[in-house]
Amino acid sequence: SVRQLERLGIRTVGALAAADADVLEQRLGKGGRLLHAYANGYDPAPVHRIADLPPPKSIGNSATAPRDLICEADARAALLSLAESVGARLRLEGYQCRTVELSVRTADLHWRSHRMALRHPSDLTSELLDAALALCEQAHLWPDPLRSIGIRALDLVPACAPHQLDLFEDAEHRARQRQLDITLDNLRARYGKTCVLRGRACFDPALGLVQREEHAFLRK
């Protein structure tokens, strides 16, 4: 296409915009007319509302730990940070997930993944963490040390979409949990990700993916 445009004396966007669209179509096919439209700032593709766009297939995060994870307590510290990250992205983009996937890589570099369907769509950090920990227990990961670990939210639906209530669901408790998560999201967006930490992250800042020098309370 570049060579054919040069043969027509077209070397700049301005020259392309001023060219004859019919001639461009004759020489380049339908792509020639499309290039002419783009050069003139016109995109013939229909405009879609964000709500009409299909949701992403998944939202996830993973990390390689600074040391091997050798027990459930190690995994919990790392998964808490990952669950907060994935939950924050779900809430920011306006989605909830119906499935949680746990992925791990052992110290001998073998990958494993396990999935769990949730009782109801969720973007709550606590529910993502609980699902990931349940998958850890079901997978019988130990005593094999883990080198890296990740959480992925699958089967996404818009957070505003209606869902059937569970007879045993504590809607008020979930609403309070979500408001707490949103408050933490807003604080971290304004003051930095380490402005508020959950207590567990302070026991092993490295596994909680918190840099000690970034937070005054963790400095020696």
Predicted regions and their residues:
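Acidic, metal-coordinating catalytic segment for phosphate/diphosphate chemistry
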Residues: 121-220
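DNA-contacting surface of Y-family translesion DNA polymerases
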Residues: 2-146
